[in-house]
C-alpha cells in the first residue's frame, strides 16, 4: 500500500443542519450509493418500525433525532469517504463542535421551505471559525418551498458567505420536474425513465411549463450578476457551492456526491499547542480523541474512543504515547464503523477515523503519538454548562452501577459532573435540558441504575485557581464544588452574585470556559 496515495483518497466531512432538515436521510442515501446499505431507511419510521441506519442509540430511534455523532465509511469513485453525522439537536452542540474539529469539510443541509435556521447558523459559525470548506444541499424540493433566489440571498446575508449554485430547480412540490445542472450543463429529470437530457431538449420537454421560463430567466440573472465559480474560494471557506435536491426521494444526491468528491479537500494538518502544524504526510503516526462513546454494544458494556488520524499510518498492535499521562498504550482492538456494525481494522491512514476500545485510558482531547514524539495537539473546545441538576441513586443497593454509569457518561462529555465541596453531593451540568433526559434514559437502560434528579436551575459557572481558594468564600449566593478533574469551581446563582464576589475579592481571578 502506497501510504501517500491512500491519504490522497481520503475525504472526511461532517453533515450539519437544523433538526428535521433531512440530515440523517441524506446520510442514508450517501451510504446507499457507497453500497453500505441495500435500501435507505427513513428517519420517520416510527410507525413502520424501520429506523435510520445511522441513528443506532435506543433513544434516537424513539425520538427520531440524532443525539450522538455517528461515523460511517464507504468507498465511491476511487475515494475513501468518512462521514460524521452530527447531532442536530441544539443541546448537543458540545459533541458537534468537537466533531467539527475532526473533519476537513462540512456539508450543510437546509430545508428549502424554512431556509437558514438557528442551529444551522450556530454550527456554521464554528465551521467558519475553522476555515474549512462548506458545501450546501438545499433539501426537500419534493415539497413546496421558498424561491431559490430568496434562499441564496438569505444564505449570503445571514451566514456572510458567497454562494454559487451548481444546479437550479425546475418547479418544486407537485410541480417539481427536475434540475437544470449548471455545472455539468445538462438537465436532470425527476419524472420518467430517463435520468438526464441535454439542455437543447429543455424547450421540448418543458415548453408548456411556466416554471421553465422562470428558470431560464433566473439563470440569465445568475450568469450576469452572480458570483464567479472559484475552487480556491471554496477551499478557503469563502464560497459555498449550492446543490438543490430531495434526499427523501433520492433525487440530486448522487450528482451532489460526485461533484462534492471532486472539490472536497484531502486531509489537512492539525495544529500543536506550540502552533506548529503536523503534516498528514509525516511518516510518524499521530491522532487525537475527539469523542468517547459508551455502550455502542449494550451486550458488552464497551467504550470506544473515536480517534482522528492526523498523520502517518495506524497498524494494529502498535504502541502509542499518551502525553497527558506520560504513559503508553497498545492499539490492538481497533474498529471502523458503519453505524451499528463495526469491523476490526488492521491499518488506516491520515484522514481516517478509528475507534479504539477503551477501558478508561482515554479522555476527550487526548493526543496519541509514537516514538520520541511527545507533543500535544491544541485543546478541543470545552463548554460552560448553563443548567444544573442534583443527582443520586434511587436504590442504595445500586451504588456500584450508579457510579460506573456516571463515570462513563461523564467521560463521553454528554454531561459535566460537579461534586459539592461541603456535602459531597453530585451535581450535573448541561447546555440544554435534553442532555439530562438522555442521561437519565441511558443510566436506566444501559446501567440498570435508576436515578433521582432535582433541578437547581441556571447557574453562572467560574473556575478558581486552587492556590486562590479559601473555603470561607462560599456563601448562600454560590456553591463551591469540584469538577471531574478535582479543580475548584463556583456555581453562582446569578450574574449579580458573581459581581458581588468579584467586588469582594478583587485579586482573585475567575476563569470562564467557552
UniProtKB/Swiss-Prot annotation:
SUPFAM superfamilies, per database record: EF-G C-terminal domain-like, P-loop containing nucleoside triphosphate hydrolases, Translation proteins
Subcellular location: Cytoplasm
GO cellular component: cytosol
Domain tr-type G: 8-268
Biological processes annotated in GO: regulation of translational termination
Keywords: Cytoplasm, GTP-binding, Nucleotide-binding, Protein biosynthesis
Entries under CDD domains matching the protein: RF3, RF3_III
InterPro entries registered for this protein in UniProt: EF-G-like_DII (IPR053905), EFG_III/V (IPR035647), G_TR_CS (IPR031157), P-loop_NTPase (IPR027417), PrfC (IPR004548), RF3_C (IPR032090), RF3_dom_3_sf (IPR038467), RF3_GTP-bd (IPR041732)
Pfam family, one: RF3_C
Family indicated by similarity: Belongs to the TRAFAC class translation factor GTPase superfamily. Classic translation factor GTPase family. PrfC subfamily.
Record's function text: Increases the formation of ribosomal termination complexes and stimulates activities of RF-1 and RF-2. It binds guanine nucleotides and has strong preference for UGA stop codons. It may interact directly with the ribosome. The stimulation of RF-1 and RF-2 is significantly reduced by GTP and GDP, but not by GMP.
Name used for this protein in its record: Peptide chain release factor 3
Native organism: Streptococcus pneumoniae (strain CGSP14)
Protein encoded by which gene: prfC
Amino acid at each position: 500500500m502506497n501510504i501517500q496515495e491512500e491519504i490522497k483518497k481520503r475525504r472526511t466531512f461532517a453533515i450539519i443542519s437544523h433538526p428535521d432538515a433531512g440530515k440523517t436521510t441524506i446520510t442514508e442515501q450517501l451510504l446507499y450509493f457507497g453500497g453500505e446499505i441495500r435500501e435507505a431507511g427513513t428517519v420517520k419510521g416510527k410507525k413502520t418500525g424501520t429506523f435510520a441506519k445511522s441513528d443506532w442509540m435506543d433513544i434516537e430511534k424513539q425520538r427520531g433525532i440524532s443525539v450522538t455523532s455517528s461515523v460511517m465509511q464507504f468507498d465511491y469513485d476511487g475515494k475513501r469517504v468518512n462521514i460524521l453525522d452530527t447531532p442536530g439537536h441544539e443541546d448537543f452542540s458540545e459533541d458537534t463542535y468537537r466533531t467539527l474539529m475532526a473533519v476537513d469539510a462540512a456539508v450543510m443541509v437546509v430545508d428549502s421551505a424554512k431556509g437558514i435556521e438557528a442551529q444551522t447558523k450556530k454550527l456554521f459559525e464554528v465551521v467558519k471559525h475553522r476555515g474549512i470548506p462548506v458545501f450546501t444541499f438545499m433539501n426537500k424540493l419534493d415539497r413546496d418551498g421558498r424561491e431559490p433566489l430568496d434562499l441564496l440571498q438569505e444564505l449570503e446575508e445571514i451566514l456572510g458567505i458567497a454562494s454559487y449554485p451548481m444546479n437550479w430547480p425546475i418547479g418544486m412540490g407537485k410541480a417539481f420536474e427536475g434540475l437544470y445542472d449548471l455545472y455539468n450543463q445538462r438537465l436532470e429529470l425527476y419524472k420518467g425513465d430517463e435520468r438526464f437530457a441535454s439542455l437543447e431538449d429543455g424547450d421540448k420537454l418543458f415548453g408548456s411549463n411556466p416554471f421553465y421560463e422562470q428558470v431560464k430567466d433566473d439563470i440569465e440573472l445568475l450568469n450576469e450578476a452572480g458570483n464567479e465559480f472559484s475552487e480556491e474560494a471554496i477551499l478557503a471557506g469563502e464560497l459555498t457551492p449550492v446543490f438543490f435536491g430531495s434526499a427523501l426521494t433520492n433525487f440530486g444526491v448522487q450528482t451532489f456526491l460526485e461533484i462534492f468528491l471532486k472539490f472536497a479537500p484531502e486531509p489537512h494538518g492539525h495544529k500543536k499547542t506550540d502552533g506548529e502544524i503536523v503534516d498528514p504526510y509525516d511518516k510518524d503516526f499521530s491522532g487525537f480523541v475527539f469523542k468517547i462513546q459508551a455502550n455502542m454494544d449494550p451486550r458488552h458494556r464497551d467504550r470506544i474512543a473515536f480517534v482522528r488520524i492526523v498523520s502517518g499510518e495506524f497498524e494494529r498492535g502498535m504502541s502509542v504515547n499518551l502525553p497527558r499521562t506520560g504513559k503508553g498504550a497498545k492499539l490492538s482492538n481497533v474498529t471502523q464503523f458503519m453505524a451499528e456494525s463495526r469491523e476490526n481494522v488492521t491499518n488506516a491512514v491520515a484522514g481516517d477515523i478509528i475507534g479504539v476500545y477503551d477501558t478508561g485510558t482515554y479522555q476527550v482531547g487526548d493526543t496519541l503519538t509514537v516514538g520520541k514524539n511527545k507533543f500535544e495537539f491544541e485543546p478541543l473546545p470545552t463548554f460552560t454548562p448553563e443548567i444544573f441538576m442534583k443527582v443520586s441513586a434511587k436504590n442504595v443497593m445500586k451504588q456500584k452501577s450508579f457510579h460506573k454509569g456516571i463515570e462513563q457518561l461523564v467521560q463521553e462529555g454528554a454531561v459535566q459532573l460537579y461534586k459539592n465541596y461541603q456535602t459531597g453531593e453530585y451535581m450535573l451540568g448541561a447546555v440544554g435540558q435534553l442532555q439530562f433526559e438522555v442521561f437519565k434514559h441511558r443510566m436506566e437502560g444501559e446501567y440498570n441504575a435508576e436515578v433521582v434528579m432535582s433541578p437547581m436551575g441556571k447557574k453562572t459557572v467560574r473556575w478558581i485557581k486552587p492556590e486562590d481558594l479559601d473555603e470561607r468564600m462560599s456563601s448562600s449566593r454560590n456553591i463551591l464544588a469540584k469538577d471531574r478533574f478535582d479543580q475548584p469551581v463556583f456555581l453562582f446563582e446569578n450574574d449579580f452574585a458573581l459581581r458581588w464576589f468579584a467586588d469582594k475579592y478583587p485579586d482573585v481571578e475567575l476563569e470562564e470556559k467557552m
